[in-house]
């Protein structure tokens, strides 16, 4: 029989290092204020950027879809599981992103696992990845037989060196550069124009994971490619519907030929049932709302700019963030964990982030601002951060 003491010992080590994850339970819908473990707290750690997770229009769309389509697709999409509503969402996403076509999958994590090994899976291929790319990209690369290269975060000189190595030393058949658009832990933005220039110079493809750019960057939240005006120059965009869109699911956007190929070859698409009609309908409604107005996106940025400005005035270190993602840098994992618990007692739900999510010695409280926060909410948060920050001698 398996010796489970090995697992217990490892978890005990995590506790001793302040890295053990305590999962809190929500007892209310997502919103600016939520009930967690029986306590009403200000929510500063969800990815619900635009407040869509509890939006009435999305809820009504989901309910209507259940009545019209049932609760599940009943099969994988290549057999009998593609409903008209799935295709409607794929078309709407393509229009929203300014792409030829999209393929809709179960999550953004799965979208990366579908895209990378399917298109760049040969041992003669080369994949060059930013060192701070998301875990789903790392796992997607691991599924490929391609030779792997990693470049220092946002370092274009090192990226070019890896491109030269792949082209001139490895003699790679095909080269793929992968980057997050917005890096989820630090909130900084990839230098996508420079990456695209290097890709074109070395005849490489570019893939960007836009999970934290959609609903945040670009016209009406269309993402990082739109933000930089790079339509037609990025080969694959990976998106998620679980953050700014407030629901669930992921997709790949790109040329029509690429999407048709993925529908023939991508294993997560071929061998796993698609999302429920309710999820798809809610996603479709979120896209419609963003196409109608950019009011929520503007409110998100107003809130983020105000909060970050005031936090800096208090003396907090917010790292290199360029987006509403606000890392409050505390560096020590135990301090970050204790800081988070103290905030919770004060009515603030803001989780600590430590290794392995971020490097050792880079622990933080990651604050996620939303369009549904009011100025009063943010002032409440600022007051509590100041109180706890002084208690821990951080400020």
Swiss-Prot record:
Pfam families: Aminotran_1_2 (PF00155). The keyword Cell inner membrane does not apply. The keyword Transferase applies. GO terms for molecular function: 8-amino-7-oxononanoate synthase activity; glycine C-acetyltransferase activity; pyridoxal phosphate binding. Its EC number is 2.3.1.47. It comes from the Bacteria. The modification N6-(pyridoxal phosphate)lysine is found at residue 243. Keywords: Acyltransferase, Biotin biosynthesis, Pyridoxal phosphate, Transferase. InterPro entries: Aminotrans_II_pyridoxalP_BS, Aminotransferase_I/II_large, AON_synthase_class-II, AONS_Archaea/Firmicutes, AONS_Archaea/Proteobacteria, PyrdxlP-dep_Trfase, PyrdxlP-dep_Trfase_major, PyrdxlP-dep_Trfase_small. It catalyses: 6-carboxyhexanoyl-[ACP] + L-alanine + H(+) = (8S)-8-amino-7-oxononanoate + holo-[ACP] + CO2. Belongs to the class-II pyridoxal-phosphate-dependent aminotransferase family. BioF subfamily. Catalyzes the decarboxylative condensation of pimeloyl-[acyl-carrier protein] and L-alanine to produce 8-amino-7-oxononanoate (AON), [acyl-carrier protein], and carbon dioxide. This is 8-amino-7-oxononanoate synthase. Transmembrane segments: none annotated. Gene3D superfamilies: Aspartate Aminotransferase, domain 1, Type I PLP-dependent aspartate aminotransferase-like (Major domain). Its cofactor is pyridoxal 5'-phosphate. Homodimer. Substrate binds at residues 134, 357. Pyridoxal 5'-phosphate binds at residues 108-109, 184, 209-212, 240-243. One of its GO terms (biological process) is biotin biosynthetic process. Pathway: Cofactor biosynthesis; biotin biosynthesis.
